[in-house]
Structure formats: C-alpha cells, structure tokens
C-alpha cells in the first residue's frame, strides 16, 4: 500500500510518500510545495495543483493530513484551514480516501511522546525509514503523517506495528525517547 502524508501550510506544504508492506516501511519521496508571495487564491491554487501533481505522479492508495489546531491568532488558523482545504481538494480530486490526525496523535504514533520536538520527529522519521539524510521539518512531518496512518494513528506503545521495524534497527522507545 502506498500512503501520501501531507503537512499543510500556506507558505510551505510538506509531502511524503511511503510504501507499506506488512510491518515494513519504505521511503518513496518527500519534499515541499512552496507558494509564491501572491494573493490568497493564487497560493491556494498552487497547493491544489502541487498536491494533484504528487497524486498523479506517485499514485498513492491513501492519504493522511494533519488536522488544524486553534491557534492564538484566529487569522492564522483561518489561513491554515484554507491551505488544508486546498490540499484536501487535491487529494479528493485524485480519488484518495483521506484520514485526519492531530499533531498529538502524529507525535505519539511516530515518536511515542505527544510533546515531541521537531528535531525528535526528524530523527525518528530518518531512523524508521532508514534515510541517508535528515528531511526538512515540513517533509519529516508529512512522512510522519504517512507513518502514523500506516499504523492506524495509534500510539507507539500500543501498536506493536513499529516494534519489529525498530528492533531490526536495534532501537526501542523508552519514555518517549528513541534508545539503542
């Protein structure tokens, strides 16, 4: 099964594609969609077109996207919601089922700790997918979203699904930290 993860943002939208076979996770591609400094409609169109292109080029079976959180600044929350909507439209236009997870669910499923830092997310994604280099934070969050979906969005402690992948690499999670 191929899963596309999306980390929505008005300026930068991260994407990550992984293949899942049993408990094995394989990296396919990741990156970001950068919007131009332009009016809102143009930026949303760029996100929609970018996501549509990724769906067309990589043919994922399912997609997962981060839910919007209510920020201190309501204007920022509204803009993020619109960017997220443009990405969802690109996914749905490509015929994909879309799952949604909160940032807390994402961090718990990937790192094992709901208050994990960006660096911890990047480190864990790099290790789980056996990447030679560390992806940027937006791409890492998107890859993490795909990993979260691959394992049903459950926490690392209840899932057993990541345990074999971690054990193969000589790793385990203890108190929300990756230890070897």
Swiss-Prot record:
InterPro entries xref list: RNaseH-like_sf, RNaseH_sf, X-over_junc_endoDNase_Mg_BS, X-over_junc_endoDNase_RuvC
Record: active site: 7, 66, 138
Compartment(s) where it occurs, according to its Swiss-Prot or TrEMBL record: Cytoplasm
Gene Ontology molecular functions: crossover junction DNA endonuclease activity; DNA binding; magnesium ion binding
Positions bound to Mg(2+) 1: 7, 138
GO biological process: DNA recombination; DNA repair
Swiss-Prot/TrEMBL keywords: Cytoplasm, DNA damage, DNA recombination, DNA repair, DNA-binding, Endonuclease, Hydrolase, Magnesium, Metal-binding, Nuclease
Reactions that this protein is recorded to catalyse: Endonucleolytic cleavage at a junction such as a reciprocal single-stranded crossover between two homologous DNA duplexes (Holliday junction)
Enzyme Commission number(s): 3.1.21.10
Cofactor note: Binds 2 Mg(2+) ion per subunit.
GO cellular component: cytoplasm; Holliday junction resolvase complex
The protein's required cofactors: Mg(2+)
Annotated Mg(2+) 2 binding sites: 66
Family: Belongs to the RuvC family.
Function: The RuvA-RuvB-RuvC complex processes Holliday junction (HJ) DNA during genetic recombination and DNA repair. Endonuclease that resolves HJ intermediates. Cleaves cruciform DNA by making single-stranded nicks across the HJ at symmetrical positions within the homologous arms, yielding a 5'-phosphate and a 3'-hydroxyl group; requires a central core of homology in the junction. The consensus cleavage sequence is 5'-(A/T)TT(C/G)-3'. Cleavage occurs on the 3'-side of the TT dinucleotide at the point of strand exchange.
NCBIfam families for this protein: ruvC
Subunit text: Homodimer which binds Holliday junction (HJ) DNA. The HJ becomes 2-fold symmetrical on binding to RuvC with unstacked arms; it has a different conformation from HJ DNA in complex with RuvA. In the full resolvosome a probable DNA-RuvA(4)-RuvB(12)-RuvC(2) complex forms which resolves the HJ.
Protein name, as recorded: Crossover junction endodeoxyribonuclease RuvC
Organism the protein comes from: Burkholderia orbicola (strain MC0-3)
Classification lineage: Bacteria, Pseudomonadati, Pseudomonadota, Betaproteobacteria, Burkholderiales
């Amino acid at each position: 099964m191929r899963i596309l993860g999306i980390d929505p943002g008005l300026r930068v939208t991260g994407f990550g594609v992984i293949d899942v076979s049993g408990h094995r996770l394989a990296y396919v591609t990741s990156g970001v969609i950068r919007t131009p400094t332009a009016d809102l409609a143009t930026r949303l169109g760029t996100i929609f077109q970018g996501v549509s292109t990724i769906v067309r080029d990589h043919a994922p079976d399912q997609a997962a996207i981060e839910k919007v959180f209510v920020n201190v600044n309501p204007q920022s929350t509204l803009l993020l919601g619109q960017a997220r909507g443009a990405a969802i439209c690109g996914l749905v236009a490509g015929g994909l089922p879309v799952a949604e997870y909160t940032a807390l669910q994402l961090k718990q499923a990937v790192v094992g700790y709901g208050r994990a830092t960006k660096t911890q997310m990047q480190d864990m994604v790099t290790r789980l997918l056996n990447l030679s280099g560390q992806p940027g934070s937006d791409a890492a969050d998107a890859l993490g979203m795909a990993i979260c979906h691959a394992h049903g969005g459950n926490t690392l402690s209840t899932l057993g699904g990541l345990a074999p992948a971690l054990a193969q690499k000589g790793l385990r999670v203890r108190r929300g930290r990756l230890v070897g």
